[in-house]
């Protein structure tokens, strides 16, 4: 189900301030901020200053762009999904569907864009120990990868339940030389891994850099992570011009914390002719307690250092999230997504576990691409979206990751034994 503001609440495009920098105290409207222990304030200030200096330094941006090309494998292609397009074609036409192939990056997902950028920042700040949280394991693998590349010590915090679901990625991280620390608190998933990583950072802030994996957390992380992922949308904008001579009509991406979606959306936010659609995890259904549809069903609150929309009970306590996808299994969302929803610039929908599985199977069978379960949520929304779109509409979906890591989960759900 789509969650949008009433027509009267649609924003004046001239009032949008997507230029990348948030307002005072790291705010996107009322969202964002720095709700952290005093111990971390100097580290956050250092990170913000170092990032600003780095982006202004041609040596830094030159090295980053060189590694994005030669190590990560960018630019990723914009692929015309001809059979998926044909599947949704109607007698009166229908949209043309394109995939931004972030699954073709080194390590198999978009996460490497941010991990690489932050590792270079850590080197610039003289930090030799890296920590990170991970849910599906893709951010953990990306972080372990860049730590191996630059000779940095690496500790990845991962919920015990996610370690069970993503055993392949756990092995990959360890093979890359990282220590994977299981977290058994709470639901033993991404929220709990993030909390444990923050505790580590508070204790070891002088020597350690925390490579936060999404556009969440205290300022400057939502801005920092978004800026490292904005290469996705920057490439897509140029590729759309080359492929069909104009901007796309619709951009769509899955949303957990929201980094892949923000990376795609951000370069288009001021292009108000382009619809931005984020797809969340409805789990067993948004009418049940077992879902992760934070924007669709959440209320404003504070989690992991920032104010954003959260899943909460009637007492304001953060609720446990559920999704078949470990990467979307999070009760919060990046504050800029909350802001884009509140001002009406972006739309957000939610699809169930079963719908996501159907989307994964459809794309696998029609395009020969096995997407990650996270990405499959965006594909699943095509079922509701496409009948509403006119002939000639150009739709770009961020194929944020490949599905190798999810084969065991999918097989289990489909009743197959490996």
From Swiss-Prot:
Residues 1-28 are annotated as: Disordered. It holds the Pfam family PALP. The keyword Translocase does not apply. The modification N6-(pyridoxal phosphate)lysine is found at residue 111. GO terms for molecular function: tryptophan synthase activity. CDD domains: Trp-synth_B. Tetramer of two alpha and two beta chains. The beta subunit is responsible for the synthesis of L-tryptophan from indole and L-serine. This is Tryptophan synthase beta chain. It comes from Synechococcus sp. (strain CC9902). The lineage of its organism: Bacteria, Bacillati, Cyanobacteriota, Cyanophyceae, Synechococcales.
């Amino acid at each position: 189900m789509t969650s949008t503001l009433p027509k009267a609440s649609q924003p004046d495009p001239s009032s949008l301030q997507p230029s990348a920098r948030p307002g005072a105290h790291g705010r996107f409207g009322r969202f964002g901020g720095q709700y952290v222990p005093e111990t971390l304030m100097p580290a956050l200030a250092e990170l913000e200053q170092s990032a600003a200096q780095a982006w202004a330094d041609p040596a830094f941006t030159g090295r980053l762009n060189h590694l994005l090309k030669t190590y990560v494998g960018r630019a990723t292609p914009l692929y015309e999904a001809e059979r998926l397009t044909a599947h949704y074609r109607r007698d009166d036409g229908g949209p043309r569907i394109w995939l931004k192939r972030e699954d073709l990056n080194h390590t198999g997902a978009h996460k490497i864009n941010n991990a690489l950028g932050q590792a270079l920042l850590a080197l610039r700040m003289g930090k030799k120990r890296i920590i990170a949280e991970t849910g599906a394991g893709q951010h953990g693998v990306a972080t372990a990868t860049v730590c191996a590349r630059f000779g940095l010590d690496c500790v990845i915090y991962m919920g015990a339940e996610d370690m069970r679901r993503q055993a392949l990625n756990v092995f990959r991280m360890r093979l890359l030389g990282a220590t994977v620390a299981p977290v058994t608190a709470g639901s033993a998933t991404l929220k709990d891994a993030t909390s444990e990583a923050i505790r580590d950072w508070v204790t070891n802030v002088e020597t350690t850099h925390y490579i936060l994996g999404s556009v969440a957390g205290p300022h400057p992380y939502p801005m920092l992570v978004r800026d490292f992922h904005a290469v996705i949308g920057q490439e897509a904008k140029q590729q759309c011009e080359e492929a069909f001579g104009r901007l796309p009509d619709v951009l769509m991406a899955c949303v957990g914390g929201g980094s892949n979606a923000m990376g795609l959306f951000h370069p288009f936010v001021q292009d108000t002719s382009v619809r931005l659609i984020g797809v969340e995890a409805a789990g067993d259904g948004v009418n049940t307690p077992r879902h992760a549809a934070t924007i669709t069903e959440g209320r404003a609150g504070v989690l992991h250092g920032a104010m954003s929309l959260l899943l909460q009970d009637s007492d304001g306590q953060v609720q446990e999230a559920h999704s078949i996808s470990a990467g979307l299994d999070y009760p919060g969302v990046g504050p800029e997504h909350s802001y884009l929803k509140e001002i009406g610039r972006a739309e957000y929908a939610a699809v169930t576990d079963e719908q996501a599985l159907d989307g994964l199977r459809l794309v696998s069978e029609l395009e020969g691409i096995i997407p990650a379960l996270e990405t499959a949520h965006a594909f699943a929304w095509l079922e509701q979206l496409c009948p509403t779109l006119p002939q000639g509409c150009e739709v770009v979906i961020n194929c944020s990751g490949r599905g190798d890591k999810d084969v065991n989960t999918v097989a289990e759900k489909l009743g197959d034994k490996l």
